[in-house]
Curated annotation (Swiss-Prot):
Pfam families: NAD_kinase, NAD_kinase_C
Name of the protein in its database record: NAD kinase
Positions with a binding annotation for NAD(+): D88, G89, R93, N162, E163, K173, N192, T203, A204, Y205, S206, F207, S208, Q262
Molecular functions per Gene Ontology: ATP binding; metal ion binding; NAD binding; NAD+ kinase activity
Entry EC number(s): 2.7.1.23
Keyword Cell inner membrane (UniProt): no
């Protein structure tokens, strides 16, 4: 059995990382870590046989696909669990590494809010026991995918848990975008960007840009303009079986494609981005009981009294 561990690289997370590696190794499971954790002294001192992705041989574990200027990767061997130590960014990086594998993902919260990660550092012993015994529930969340066409040829595929966005590359510039739903042009906008978000991503960038909060089990896709110049350019909620096409009409090419907050590709005028819901779900492992409403109240510190 293999456990994949993602680490945010911060000193504060090292003791937690080392402890988890030791707990996992004590239960006769092998540990593969992401490159951020490969120089971690806490793990090396556990004598637990912890192996980084690079040490294990990247070609053995990784499917590499390089499209200038971004490089995407995914791991092509099975893991019984993935554990991230950090905030939402670390969790999202782990989800990307393990995409399309069906691996249950768990997050230990070392960040400020950590909306996607719900395990506190003091609960890591119980977490490992729950994983070993299979005592956890699974929430299946559908990702969002995008395919970029340039001059009639596909040049890039993208994947995200929360959102795929088209954004301006330079401050002070706007992005001109045509939005099509099922082949019908529904919006021509000048804006700072546009967000195509999943239900899971409704509490992330979409929320901060005026999009609605959507319960994660809802099968919908959100289209949310960022600071649009048009008066009636409002967020749209679509069933997840609708096709969404974005066409870049900006003339200066100062536009980028991002997934889960990371720049993946520089776009050009005329590029077309087709967005669809992914077919293979992301599996969130849960060891705590609780409803989404309670999670909202806690994470956003809502005043309910």
């Amino acid at each position: 059995m293999r456990v994949y561990i993602a680490h945010n690289g911060c000193l504060e997370a090292e003791p937690i990382y080392g402890t988890i590696c030791e707990l996992v190794a004590q239960r006769k499971m092998s540990v593969i870590t992401d490159p951020h954790a490969r120089n971690n002294e806490s793990a090396r001192n556990t004598d637990s046989g912890v192996v980084s992705l690079n040490q294990a041989g990247r070609n053995k574990y990784l499917d590499q696909e390089t499209t200038s200027p971004a490089t995407s990767r995914s791991i092509n061997v099975p893991f019984c669990a993935g554990i991230s130590i950090g905030g939402d960014g670390t969790f999202l990086r782990m989800a990307r590494d393990l995409k399309n594998t069906g691996t249950p993902l768990f997050g230990v919260n070392m960040g400020r809010m950590g909306f996607l990660v719900d395990i506190e550092p003091e609960d890591i012993v119980n977490l490992v026991e729950n994983i070993v015994k299979g005592e956890y529930t699974e929430e299946k969340r559908l990702p969002i995918t995008a395919s970029v066409q340039r001059g009639g040829k596909k040049i890039h595929d993208e994947w995200a848990v929360n959102e795929i966005t088209i954004e301006r590359k330079v401050e002070g510039k706007v992005v001109d975008i045509e939005v099509f739903v099922d082949g019908c042009r529904v919006m021509d906008i000048s804006c700072n960007g546009i967000i195509i978000a999943t239900a899971t991503g409704s509490t992330a960038y979409s929320f901060s840009s005026g999009g609605p909060i959507v319960w994660p089990e809802m099968k919908v896709t959100l289209v949310v303009p960022v600071s649009p110049h048009e008066l009636f350019a409002k967020p749209i909620v679509l069933p997840d079986n609708r096709s969404i096409l974005l066409k870049v009409t900006s003339r200066d090419n100062k536009v980028v494609l991002c997934s889960d907050g990371q720049v993946r590709l520089c776009l050009q005028s005329g590029d077309e981005i087709a967005c669809h819901v992914g077919k293979v779900p992301v599996v969130f492992g849960r060891v705590k009981k609780g409803c989404f409403a309670e999670h909202l109240v806690k994470k956003f510190n809502l005043q309910t009294a």
